[in-house]
Amino acid sequence: MNLDRLSLLHDVADAVAAAFADVRDFGPSGLRDGQYTLDVVANEAALTVLRRSGVGVLSEESEFEAGSTGEVVVIDPIDGSTNASRGVRYFATAMCMVDAEGPVAALVANQATGERYWAIRGGGAWCDGVRIGPTDCVDVTDSIIGMNGIPPHPLGYRQSRVLGAVALDLCHVAAGVFDGYVDCVTEAHGVWDYLASVMICREAGAHVVDLHGRDLVVLDHRARRTPIAAATPELLALLVAARAGL
């Protein structure tokens, strides 16, 4: 059953990839601030597949749609749409299916490279069929950290990267590419930005929290969170403390 759910998410990612390949207008949609035409095209492609399955949908690009199955897919059709609009090959379709018990399946597909990260509840986390896991880093001074935004002063890390797509940044923590992730912009992210990657991180053995201790699993279009992630509990505590001090 969970594999069927994951298969649905792969089908959605395939549909978005096909629609994106036909996009020629990379400018603003004119419908709301920060939205590109490619976001609208990707969202329509995703909704076409999801509606057929009967699941509910919570998308960044449209209103909540109730379904008939008791499950909801939280989706950002294109996370990192500014990157996509400028030709930066770091943007993804991020999806997490949620049932009455919480996240049950997740997929993050880099639509520029074809790389895909996924997880099912209790089944670990994977990248293109290879099981993934985080590093064992416990010291900020040894860490390479993905970030959203620029802090007013360094947080003690060895190096940092600001790449512009939180869904992929968090997957890189799950896969041991980054040791951690810090959101330096207050209340910047909706649940569609991070939930798929949070599930992938947790199934991989990495740790993710909201800066203020709030639940990250929230089916509310208006809710915003400040995610912090790390390979180990020790590093997470240090990153949370450093971020709280900004």
Give, region by region, the residue ranges found by the protein language model.
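N-terminal subdomain of lithium-sensitive/metallo-dependent phosphomonoesterases centered on the IMPase/IPPase/PAP
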Residues: 1-78, 244
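Residue-level signal for inorganic ion chemistry
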Residues: 16, 39, 81, 110, ...
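Buried hydrophobic packing segments
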Residues: 46, 50, 93, 97, ...
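An extended, acidic
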Residues: 52, 132-246
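General beta-strand structural signal in soluble alpha/beta enzymes
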Residues: 56-61, 75, 84, 162-164, ...
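DPxDG-like acidic metal-binding loop motif
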Residues: 69-122
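Short loop segments at secondary-structure junctions
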Residues: 98-101, 112, 121-124, 150, ...
